[in-house]
UniProtKB/Swiss-Prot annotation:
Cysteine pairs bridged by disulfides in the record: none
Record's protein name: Methionine import ATP-binding protein MetN 1
InterPro entries assigned to the protein according to its UniProt record, in alphabetical order: AAA+_ATPase, ABC_transporter-like_ATP-bd, ABC_transporter-like_CS, ACT-like_dom_sf, MetN_ABC, MetN_ABC_transporter-like, NIL_domain, P-loop_NTPase
Organism for this UniProt entry: Staphylococcus aureus (strain MRSA252)
Record: residues binding ATP: 38-45
Gene: metN1
Taxonomy of the source species: Bacteria, Bacillati, Bacillota, Bacilli, Bacillales
Principal location class: membrane
UniProt catalytic activity: L-methionine(out) + ATP + H2O = L-methionine(in) + ADP + phosphate + H(+); D-methionine(out) + ATP + H2O = D-methionine(in) + ADP + phosphate + H(+)
PANTHER family, alphabetized: AMINO ACID IMPORT ATP-BINDING PROTEIN, METHIONINE IMPORT ATP-BINDING PROTEIN METN
């Protein structure tokens, strides 16, 4: 649905070149809720501007719904832009217009009939739960209600793609959760492909099925949300995951436990999915290695509607200890693991 092929984007200011994007490649599939996460300045919003053709790539290709728009003119982009909706962090509503007129604006600009406008706007306001607010003005609404108006406005043209640029950053946690639920409903009800730009890993965890992690203009990690949460490969991905899920004991706890440890030991970090939780993992490990297994840490969380568990296990070592058998067990059971000592 959206594809970036070795895309780079540079800006030139006062004899200085700023590389906003460097050789970015990834694909957003049809019906995805695809998250792009990174800190400020990572290049996330530049990607959105390329999809909207507000900026042109310096190098590479940008493919939208099968069209290579890299070198499209504004005129050539008109029909494609009709299939792209957009919501922003600060809503971008007209304060002098009612909720109804704000939602209707794209249809008014497209010169649709009054009958069609009334029908379509009424449908969208009902969908976002604001039918009773149609005659109110933005200043009379809460932040969450304003974002619902913005979502209705983005949907009123029946787009194929919805771009969300930090759409929940200005909202409190409870309101954020309700907006994410609404966006998931948008995806499921209308089959709209959603590209989420965010710096909040909780947004990725709660709504996205796939994610790209960006740092300094580059995509440093991509994968399913489960893959990235279960085994983040890069330091920045590990840092983002740790903001919403504690996946291992604190360094201070490890130091205290190590100080009390007698003899050599080996530690494992494992990631257990919901479908694996009925297996007697600890009991199996005790039988395999013939010794006690210490659980130094355990935490559970929910990712994409599935419960997952992170555990840190410790085995005392001696000459009879067979780490190969433990590794083989994890592989046979498809349990993701990492030796950490």
């Amino acid at each position: 649905m959206i594809e970036f092929r070795q895309v780079s984007k540079s800006f030139h200011k006062k004899k200085q070149t700023i590389d906003a994007l460097k050789d970015v490649s990834f694909t957003v599939n049809r019906n995805d809720i695809f998250g792009v996460i990174g800190y400020s300045g990572a290049g996330k919003s530049t990607l959105v501007r390329l999809v909207n053709h507000l900026e042109a790539a310096s190098n590479g290709q940008v493919i939208v719904d099968g069209h290579d728009i890299t070198n499209y003119s504004d005129k050539m982009m008109r029909d494609i832009k009709k299939d792209i909706g957009m919501i922003f962090q600060h809503f971008n509503l007209l304060n002098s217009a009612t909720v109804f007129k704000n939602v209707a604006m794209p249809l008014i600009l497209s010169k649709k009939s009054k009958t069609e406008i009334k029908q379509r706007v009424t449908e969208m306001l009902e969908f976002v739960g604001l039918s009773d607010k149609k005659d109110q003005f933005p200043d009379e609404l809460s932040g969450g209600q304003k974002q619902r108006v913005a979502i209705a406005r983005a949907l009123v043209t029946n787009p194929k793609i919805l771009l969300c640029d930090e759409a929940t950053s200005a909202l409190d946690p409870a309101t954020t959760a309700s907006i994410l639920t609404l966006l998931k409903n948008v995806n499921q009800t209308f089959g709209i492909t959603i590209m989420m730009i965010t710096h909040e890993m909780r947004v990725i965890k709660d709504i996205c099925n796939r994610v790209a992690v960006m740092e300094k203009g580059q995509v440093v990690e991509t994968g399913t949300v489960k893959e990235v949460f279960s085994h983040p490969k890069t330091t920045i991905a590990q840092n983002f995951v740790s903001t919403v899920i504690q996946t291992e004991p604190s360094p201070s706890l490890i130091r205290r436990l190590n100080d009390k440890q007698v003899g050599d030991f080996k530690d494992y970090k494992i990631f257990v999915e919901e479908t694996q939780m009925t297996q007697p993992i600890i009991n199996d490990l005790i039988q395999i290695c013939g010794r006690e297994v210490k659980i130094l840490f355990s935490s559970m969380s929910e990712i994409q509607g599935n419960t997952v568990c992170y555990m840190w296990l410790r085995f005392n070592m001696d000459q009879q200890f067979d780490g190969t058998a433990i590794n083989q067990y994890f592989k046979e059971k498809n349990i993701q693991f990492e030796e950490v000592h």
